[in-house]
Amino acid sequence: MKIQKIEAKSIVDSRKEPTIEVSVLTQKGKFISSAPNGKSKGKFEANPYIKSLQQDINFINNIKPKILRKLKIEEFKELKEIEAFAEKNIGANSLFALESSILKALAAEQEKQLWEFLSRGKPKKLPYPVGNVVGGGLHGKGFKGKEPDFQE
């Protein structure tokens, strides 16, 4: 797959907080992904951005066309090339948005839906619905003195 252009910009998430959006342009179209920040942060959680959202955006937007031509991504496992290139230059949220956009482009390149591309021909199974029942931690505000001490 030939990537013609990669572009990043700042958008706002559902809580009106800034986050990153990355678009990847190929011959098959434009593929866009974003990665909102969580409200709380675990002690083992990766940093969403290296130093700042704007620094990650600048790094992605300054990827030279010469470098894009060298990146040959045809399969899921070849995303390691992107990770090696971007490591120590962008944070986890930026990398997620970038790789998600590339995955969408790869799926389109093979004329598949994203779920079909990721399942690699394995039989279809219905997903199990997952949802929050208890909104504890930083999400439990508003219970007026009855906030749970834990977060699901």
Task: Pin down the residues of each PLM region.
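Metal- or metallocofactor-binding catalytic centers and their adjacent structured scaffolds
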Residues: 36-112
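Short beta-strand scaffold segments in enzyme catalytic cores
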Residues: 20-24
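Glycine-centered tight beta-turn/hairpin loop motif at sheet-sheet or coil-to-beta transitions
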Residues: 26-28
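Acidic, glycine-rich active-site loops and adjacent beta-strand->loop/helix elements
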Residues: 12, 37-39, 120-124, 134
